[in-house]
């Protein structure tokens, strides 16, 4: 994936304003609510019996923070997403057996959360750059599957 200087600027500019803990927890929580079959990867997370239980679950929030922190690595390494996510790709493929489609779904959740948090600042141009980034991360995470 090649990012233009403008795309990089738009992504890093917004990233500097992102609350990683809040956004990450909300993105993973939404993923688990909207796509309930993804819950099977999180059996150890305890109560996920309802949307409010999922959104308030401390383990969901903690994992969300971890996920979004790794997105920070993507922002810093846009020119080497495959290398940046090689170890995580291996973990999710070989050990956890996560369906790579879930990475795309999570990326879309992140874009939705950013749009809701940043409103008018999340212009179509900003969205286009972020969609490109989350798609690049999803592809990098799925790399070990091919």
Swiss-Prot record:
Q: Which domain of life is it from?
A: Eukaryota
GO annotation, cellular component aspect? haptoglobin-hemoglobin complex; hemoglobin complex
Indicate the segments annotated as coiled coil, or none if absent: none
**Which intervals hold domain Globin?**
2-146
Binding positions for heme b per the UniProt entry: 63, 92
User: Could you tell me the Gene Ontology terms of the biological process aspect for this record?
Assistant: cellular oxidant detoxification; hydrogen peroxide catabolic process
Molecular-function GO term, any one = oxygen carrier activity
Per UniProt, the keywords (alphabetical) are: Heme, Iron, Metal-binding, Oxygen transport, Transport
Check the record and name the PANTHER family matching this protein.
Answer: HEMOGLOBIN FAMILY MEMBER, HEMOGLOBIN SUBUNIT EPSILON
Q: Would you identify the family this protein belongs to, as annotated?
A: Belongs to the globin family.
Any extra remark in the record? Hemoglobin theta chain is an embryonic beta-type chain.
**Name assigned to this protein:** Hemoglobin subunit theta
């Amino acid at each position: 994936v090649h990012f233009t200087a403008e795309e990089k600027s738009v992504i890093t500019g917004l990233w500097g304003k992102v609350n990683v803990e809040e956004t990450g927890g909300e993105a993973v929580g939404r993923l688990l609510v909207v796509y309930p079959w993804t819950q099977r990867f999180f059996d150890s997370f305890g109560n996920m019996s309802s949307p409010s239980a999922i959104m308030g679950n401390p383990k969901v929030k903690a994992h969300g923070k971890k996920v979004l922190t790794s997105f920070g690595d993507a922002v810093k390494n846009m020119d080497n997403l495959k290398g940046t996510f090689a170890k995580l790709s291996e973990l999710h493929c070989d050990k956890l057996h996560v369906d790579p489609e879930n990475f795309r779904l999570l990326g879309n959740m992140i874009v939705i959360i950013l749009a809701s948090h940043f409103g008018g600042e999340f212009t179509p141009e900003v969205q286009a750059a972020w969609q490109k980034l989350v798609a690049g991360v999803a592809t990098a995470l799925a790399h070990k599957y091919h």
